Amino acid sequence: MDTKDFKRLEKMYSPRYLPGLDGLRAFAVIGIIIYHLNAQWLSGGFLGVDTFFVISGYLITSLLISEYYRTQKIDLLEFWKRRLKRLIPAVLFLICVVLTFTLIFKPELIIQMKRDAIAAIFYVSNWWYISQNVDYFNQFAIEPLKHLWSLAIEEQFYLLFPLVITFLLHRFKPRNIIQTLFIVSLISLGLMIVIHFITGDNSRVYFGTDTRLQTLLLGCILAFIWPPFALKKDISKKIVVSLDIIGISGFAVLMTLFFIVGDQDQWIYNGGFYIISFATLFIIAIAVHPSSLFAKFLSMKPLLIIGKRSYSLYLWHYPIIVFVNSYYVQGQIPVYVYIIEILLTALMAEISYRFIETPIRKKGFKAFAFLPKKKSQFARTVLVILLLIPSIIVLSGQFDALGKQHEAEKKEKKTEFKTTKKKVVKKDKQEDKQTANSKEDIKKSSPLLIGDSVMVDIGNVFTKKIPNAQIDGKVGRQLVDATPIVKSQYKDYAKKGQKVVVELGTNGAFTKDQLNELLDSFGKADIYLVSIRVPRDYEGRINKLIYEAAEKRSNVHLVDWYKASAGHPEYFAYDGIHLEYAGSKALTDLIVKTMETHATNKK
């Protein structure tokens, strides 16, 4: 290849800045931040991560094929070096700050934080959280580095994909490469569906590189079909209008999904992520076109400012929200706290972007130096050292003693409360009537209480109030899990005159049919159905089903915990679901009072 040919290829395949993608990044990161602030505000905001994945797949592949077409090779070492300078410094800065903050303000969490930090440093956070059975959608646990799972997937992709694409470009035509990538994306989709069907674990398929590769590969495929360097600026107005209609329509669909999709919706784990990501391809395709008015909309200055800092904003928003929220009861956080979290996120993101990421991206590690003439370099170096020293000591395990008691308490924490099964005594009709009409006999009765971790919380308090109660509470239990248990173990309670308390729904949504099946399994027993208080997007839907069941069924009585607990943050632990002693006592008293009221009304 002579110099003339090289210059022609250089001009033809030269990569260009794509401001429209920064604008799309802005919407994605805003959605993610709102979701983590309060999932009830934007239940599908977590889909912003998938938008990032598709963009990453598209951009990285575009850069790689552009380089290959220009030079007939891909400099892998240079590619990895650029990724290193772009991603790692900001993550290390974040981890050092989080470890230092934990050491000073949350020392009891130091062991957990050390383990999470090590996983984050080596970009294996997603597999680490899978191995620890971490629930991604449990926003109430103090896990400030949990959001780094997505960066782990991207870094794993950046490490391996260039090797694969280099091999494919040398041996196959673009059409064959597209077919190969499409098949692999379908395999990834199939793995998500199969693993989810077998395990029923949303977090396993959400965290897994194997099950999330589908989204990245769709972006890669688009880069071959619609490379940015091949798009012409001079096109007819009709084509421009058509492109904008496609872009705006796709964008409207994505934004709608941000509002209506929930993290417990099962369809998204059974092909939904693939469909949503496929729809995102149309937005990206128009966002990168040089003639699109929609691309110009995405290129507005405010969106570009946010989009260029989207990586920094993503890094910092989650630990700030987690740490600040840990001092409040979830679901009862004052509005000013959210404002503080947003401001802190913007501040730390700007510090990271301006003083860590940009200097290193431009100058490499020369941005750090002990040169008196360059105060910014000196200050930056001192700051990093001040954060690095305690972080290294934490990672070495020197402060583990501070967290050993907390780790022991976690292991000893009750995950189940179950009283010894009591024999259900059959009563004649006259005895049933007397029992129902006597408040005193409520405390001598033998009701069945079945529930989740909230039931575990009230177990000891309730048995002091009603010693003969049969209690079956288990952490993580969902309503659908309870129905087969009732049918196999508690058939004796499905009789008129028996009393049953049902407290379920904090761990996930259920349908009207599922609730009816559970209630039907108790026959004509008096059922006391407890409404839920859980700061999740499904709270209102579940309570509506509970209220409707209590209204329509003569044997179902409402225990309105949602109403009774309003304005009582002292009832709850940090997560806004589990109960402190005051809450356990209040819920116990409410259940007993509801039983007594029902007994009185039957006179």
Curated annotation (Swiss-Prot):
SUPFAM superfamilies: SGNH hydrolase. InterPro entries: Acyl_transf_3_dom (IPR002656), Acyltransferase_3 (IPR050879), SGNH_hydro_sf (IPR036514). It is an enzyme of class 2 (transferase). CDD domains: SGNH_hydrolase_yrhL_like. The active site is at S453, D575, H578. It holds the Pfam family Acyl_transf_3. GO terms for cellular component: plasma membrane. One of its GO terms (biological process) is lipopolysaccharide biosynthetic process. It comes from the Bacteria. It is a multi-pass membrane protein. It is found in: Cell membrane. Its EC number is 2.3.1.-. The chain crosses the membrane at residues 17-37, 45-65, 87-107, 148-168, 177-197, 211-231, 239-259, 268-288, 311-331, 333-353, 382-402. Keywords: Acyltransferase, Cell membrane, Membrane, Transferase, Transmembrane, Transmembrane helix. Its main location: membrane. GO terms for molecular function: acyltransferase activity, transferring groups other than amino-acyl groups. Responsible for O-acetylation at the C(6)-hydroxyl group of N-acetylmuramyl residues, forming the corresponding N,6-O-diacetylmuramic acid of the peptidoglycan. O-acetylation of the peptidoglycan is the major determinant for lysozyme resistance. Belongs to the acyltransferase 3 family. This is O-acetyltransferase OatA. It comes from Staphylococcus aureus (strain MRSA252).
